[in-house]
Amino acid sequence: MALSSTFLNPLVSSVAVNPQPKITSGKGFRVNCLIRTQQTVIKTDTKENAAVLTPGKRVEKEPSVSTVLANYHADWDPFEATSTPIYQSATFRMKNATEYNEYYYSRVANPTTSTLEKIIAEIENAEYVTCFTSGMSALTAVCELVNPGDEILTVEDIYGGSYGFIENLMVRKAGITVKRVDTSNIENVKAAMTNKTKLVWLESPSNPQLKISDIREIARIAHAYGAIVFIDNCIMSPLLSHPLELGADIVMHSATKFIAGNSSCMAGSLATNNKELADKLLSYRSATGCGLSPQDAWICLEGIKTLPLRVEEKQKNALTVANYLDNNPKITKVNYPGLPDNPGYDLHKSQSKGPGSVMSCETGSLPLSKQIVEDTKFFSKIVGFGGVGSAICLPWYTSHKAIPEPEKIRMGITKDLIRISVGIEDVQDLIQDLDNAMSTPTF
């Protein structure tokens, strides 16, 4: 079943769909590039999606990503279990007195975790993937690629956890210089780069303002200086954006979010096509013991089977919610790259396969924003995103709480800014919930 099948279902015809041409995703996978911009129904022609059948002739075609993920299993398992076995073992017997087998110590590698790494590599179109205990431990490994005296250039409105790590450990203890710039303006990037810049740290879209950076052009500029380009791609999921194909060197996902999908484990992954970088990242993981446990890897493996369905449904709902907010007089601004009037709309469309399911908005009133967050019933008040359920928070007080107030103001993060992760619920229930939360002021 192709990723676009949701939009062939008459039961979901209330949402606008503008299907784009199919784009190859991963190694032999195909997903539809879907940017929906209206609330008028545009039905996909089922004929163009139907297989061409020739009686008596065997036809081989590349399976869609949803088909591959639903059928993926550990081909090394002698019992051919449909669910990957959990190798809950710290050690594995050696081949003989002087030779290891492929697996010998789970701090270095584990069969269950390796299976997850292989399937993430497939959908990332990456040669190498290394999994970690969390997204933050993955970020820590990336920072080990720079040395005292080096410079890191980061996106301005960076995730609060990344800001805290860079500021407290890299700047104060490691002697690293950090430059924070609005990377959505390419001129800022050009002006900030020097021969000391060894790492360019991007988020596109950024968290929480959903700003869009030109990954291709920034990669070109950074590589001219010999810098590594790293992308925190958490907001997009590995299905909607492939930064490695745009010139990035390393792509990070907090697998806690979209990959696992149920907010039931912590996990992180780093993908690259550079063997030297991959060896360094694996060496760091092995030395520090921050490799993903087989139990958490298994949770991610179970979750990733439904990743295409979840990403598609969440994105479909998000487009409807974003349009609702954009036309609501109580909302002063909506940050979402799926809206045509978003400053980064065209750029994002050129380097992704969809706008995703995370957005933020402003009301101009902290009391009203607090009321919305507190009064909604179907939006969990949590700091995470990417799960099956909708989530809502005020970044000033949650995900970006640790950032000093002057810095948050400089970044453009306001107290009334609301971040929303749209889930798979009935979208009309979500809109009614938001409408009810805004209907009667309690302040």
Swiss-Prot record:
InterPro entries: Cys/Met-Metab_PyrdxlP-dep_enz, PyrdxlP-dep_Trfase, PyrdxlP-dep_Trfase_major, PyrdxlP-dep_Trfase_small. Gene3D superfamilies: Aspartate Aminotransferase, domain 1, Type I PLP-dependent aspartate aminotransferase-like (Major domain). Disulfide bonds: none annotated. The keyword Lyase applies. Coiled coil: none annotated. Signal peptide: none annotated. Keywords: Chloroplast, Lyase, Plastid, Pyridoxal phosphate, Transit peptide. It is found in: Plastid, Chloroplast. It catalyses: L-mimosine + H2O = 3-hydroxy-4H-pyrid-4-one + pyruvate + NH4(+). The modification N6-(pyridoxal phosphate)lysine is found at residue 257. GO terms for biological process: transsulfuration. Optimum pH is 8.0. Its EC number is 4.3.3.8. Its cofactor is pyridoxal 5'-phosphate. Pfam families: Cys_Met_Meta_PP (PF01053). Catalyzes the degradation of mimosine, which is a toxic secondary metabolite found in all Leucaena and Mimosa species. Belongs to the trans-sulfuration enzymes family. This is Mimosinase, chloroplastic. It comes from Leucaena leucocephala. The lineage of its organism: Eukaryota, Viridiplantae, Streptophyta, Embryophyta, Tracheophyta.
